[in-house]
């Protein structure tokens, strides 16, 4: 059900008192939670708050730098393995690139794709229109606000704003992208060039996904014909994320630890660091590589690979100095298609590890649970 678009005049007059209540800093849930869910963090940032509202304050054990390891506390970073698509297209070099891709999916669950063929004007245009969307007046953005996780176009806040015990410092715009011609007319009309720019980016992103996914199946030794056909007719959801400047970033997160549904997620980052991956028990910040896509293995690919490829936990930190924008594209099969471990990857030494699943099952789970800390994927495990 859509959330009310505009607060009434009485709510506007109460804003000062709500801000004061929000800045009590005790970490508890105060009476402003519904207000925050309706307005989002960009509005809070623009209102000039100087302390983090209690609804956004994480328990001490979950705060950045506290949950895992010295590297996180010290601000450790990681340069992810790099997959060069231009080399993948050269027959004499393809084998070496496939080995790099295979090792990255097994060890990190993350890698960066370069020389992907998507022009700088497409990538830069997408980041630019994303920033301009979040600069729109609040009433314009609120037209698309919904708490329905199944909505094809949805502006929202936090991670799962209906069920999050503590809200995340993040606003987002989700756009269903397939079939593109059927959904683009439901996308926002402001900024005026959003539909044109985002559709061009979505098409290019889908092409990169298909090329990388075909390579991943080849590296696994899995016959990819049927899978690739299902993915070509599958789903693509683009999430445009906005992480505004936060007055006390050490107390909260932009996104909690989670893994992604689907086969692969392709993330376009701006120059502001924030994405962290869990590796060897430590939270490590991914160094942004201009013009690249950060790609991570999703739950469906871990299932299809029978656990050989890893869908790993990741999260997003925020900062007090610069707004951060990213665009994540989630790719999978159609909701009714079943994902199973590939028969080629099951034998006496490698018994089947996962139950069959589908996207509809995931969406139902997300609507009924917090959906973080890989709990959905764990729910599909046989042992």
Swiss-Prot record:
Q: Disordered: where is this region?
A: 1-27
Q: Could you give one GO CC term from the UniProt record?
A: nucleus
Organ and tissue specificity: Expressed in coleoptiles, leaf sheaths, leaf blades and root tips of young seedlings. Expressed in vascular bundles of mature leaf blades. Expressed in developing culms and nodes.
Give yes or no: UniProt keyword Metal-binding: yes
Q: Which InterPro entries match?
A: DIOX_N, IPNS-like_FE2OG_OXY, IPNS-like_sf, Oxoglu/Fe-dep_dioxygenase_dom, Plant_2OG-oxidoreductases
Locate the transmembrane regions by residue number: none
Q: List S-S links within the chain.
A: none
Residues that, per the record, bind Fe cation: 258, 260, 314
Give the chief site where it resides: cytoplasm
Q: Locate the Fe2OG dioxygenase domain: which residues?
A: 234-333
- How many cofactor units bind, and how? Binds 1 Fe(2+) ion per subunit.
Q: What is its EC number?
A: 1.14.11.-
**Which Pfam families does this UniProt record tie to the protein?**
2OG-FeII_Oxy, DIOX_N
- Chain's role: Involved in the regulation of shoot development and salicylic acid (SA) homeostasis.
Other observations noted: Plants overexpressing SLC1 are infertile and exhibit defects in shoot development characterized by slender and crinkly leaves.
* Protein name (record): Probable 2-oxoglutarate-dependent dioxygenase SLC1
Which organism's genome codes for this protein? Oryza sativa subsp. japonica
């Amino acid at each position: 059900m859509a959330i009310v678009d505009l607060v009434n005049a009485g709510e506007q007059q109460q804003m000062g008192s709500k801000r004061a209540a929000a800045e009590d800093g005790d970490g508890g849930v105060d009476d402003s939670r519904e207000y925050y869910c309706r307005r989002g963090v960009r509005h809070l940032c623009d209102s000039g708050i100087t302390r983090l509202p209690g609804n956004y304050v994480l328990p001490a054990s979950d705060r950045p730098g506290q949950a895992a390891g010295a590297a996180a506390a010290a601000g450790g970073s990681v340069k992810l393995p790099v997959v060069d698509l231009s080399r993948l297209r050269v027959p004499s070099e393809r084998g070496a690139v496939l080995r790099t891709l295979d090792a990255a999916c097994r060890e990190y669950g993350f890698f960066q794709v370069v020389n992907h063929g998507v022009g700088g004007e497409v990538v830069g245009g997408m980041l630019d229109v994303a920033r301009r969307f979040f600069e729109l007046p609040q009433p314009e953005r609120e037209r698309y606000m919904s708490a329905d996780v199944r909505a094809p176009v949805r502006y929202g806040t936090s991670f799962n704003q209906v069920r999050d015990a503590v809200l995340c410092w993040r606003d987002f715009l989700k756009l269903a992208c397939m079939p593109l011609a059927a959904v683009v007319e439901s996308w926002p009309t402001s900024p005026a060039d959003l539909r044109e720019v985002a559709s061009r980016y979505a098409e290019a992103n889908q092409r990169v996904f298909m090329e990388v996914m075909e390579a991943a199946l080849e590296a696994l030794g899995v016959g990819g014909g049927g899978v690739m056909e299902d993915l070509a007719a599958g789903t693509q959801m683009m999430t445009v994320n906005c992480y505004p400047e936060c007055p006390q970033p050490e107390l909260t997160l932009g996104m909690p630890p989670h893994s992604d549904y689907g086969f692969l997620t392709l993330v376009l980052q701006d120059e502001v660091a924030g994405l962290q991956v869990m590796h060897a028990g430590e939270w490590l910040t991914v160094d942004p590589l201009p013009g690249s896509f950060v790609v991570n293995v999703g739950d469906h690919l871990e299932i299809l690979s029978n656990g050989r490829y890893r869908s790993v936990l990741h999260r997003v930190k925020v900062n007090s100095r610069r707004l951060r924008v990213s665009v994540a594209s989630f790719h999978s099969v159609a909701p009714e298609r079943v994902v199973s471990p590939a028969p080629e990857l099951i034998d006496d030494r490698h018994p089947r590890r996962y139950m069959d699943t589908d996207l509809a099952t995931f969406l139902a789970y997300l609507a009924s649970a917090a959906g973080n800390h890989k709990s959905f994927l764990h729910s599909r495990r046989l042992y």
